[in-house]
Amino acid sequence: VKNENTLSRTEEKLVEMSNGCICCTLREDLMIEVEKLAKAQKFDYLIIESTGISEPIPVAQTFSFESEDGSIDLSRFSYVDTMVTVVDAFNFLKDFSSPQYLKDRNLTDIEGDERTIVNLLTDQVEFANVILLNKTDMVTESDLRNLYDIINKLNPDARIIPTNHSKVNLQEVINTGLFDFEKAESSAGWIKELENEHIPETEEYGIGSFVYRRKKPFHPNRFLDFIQHTFPKNIIRSKGLFWIASRPDQALVWSSAGGSLKTDPAGVWWDSMPFSERINYADFVNNQQMIESEWSSDFGDRKIELVFIGQQLDVSAITKKLDECLLNQEEVSEWKDGRLQLTDNWPVSN
């Protein structure tokens, strides 16, 4: 590693991927300089240090992005070897419980950037192969073990290395061969829970997890009230799909991390369209057997599937609270007949 070698300055350009999202905008100048360095054949490895507010997935995508005219294709001479995230052991838990947005701390000047601190931290931890747990000299041994267990639960596959001043043996972060895009996308602890790869609870600090699965819909008002007023503070991370009775066709994705809770549209359920329309979608055709094996005569493929990761979780109490948010049997009967009167105050587009 030679400190005197730096990227030359170029006119900065942006390459926007097809969906036009901010987080999928790639820097063309980075691509050009990486190609120059590779063709110079002077270096074996390139270490790219992103800003603290950058998301890891677009960085990885840069190395698999190919322009339509074929002029940009980094995969011809480079690949991602390791994704490393540095965690500030002293501030992580405080930041993780913060409801603040990046703009609240003047960390972004991108118009329309509505990312929260905790969601960014979660993305960076869940996508990493190696996590440097830095500033370990500034926390107690007990807090360090607790933090280690939390991070391990968020990303069970990552190597967690305690450091001070981010000093680490280069062999831990270079030429590891650890990165695989598909594996990285499914390395998060909540995904492993959904796929029935249960991670054992850490007994000392009670970092545990469970999956809540139901077919019946949530009552829109009762579930919203649960989220706004009684959502357990000891839940560190939760994510999954759900549906509410007032929107039978719409699938919703739920996500919480620390002090941030959000819900977004996730498309429609297959049962909301006739079979003749479903078979026009590759996602349905390729997964038809699995989808139909889980089909319900009452609700089709609609389901609630939420993963909860937290500390000292009272699974039975949380399950009871969630069950109380579901339509009861009388309400289900009225709902099927179109007699159930529902109001919908969810701040999510329908």
Place the predicted regions along the sequence by residue.
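C-terminal structured domain segments
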Residues: 303-307, 323
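Short amphipathic alpha-helices in soluble, non-transmembrane regions
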Residues: 226-229, 318-326
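Residue-level signature of catalytic and energy-coupling elements of molecular machines
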Residues: 30, 49, 83, 128, ...
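Helix N-cap motif at beta-to-alpha junctions
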Residues: 311-315
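Alpha-helical scaffold elements adjacent to nucleotide-binding pockets in ATP/GTP-utilizing enzyme cores
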Residues: 29, 33-36, 58-62, 127, ...
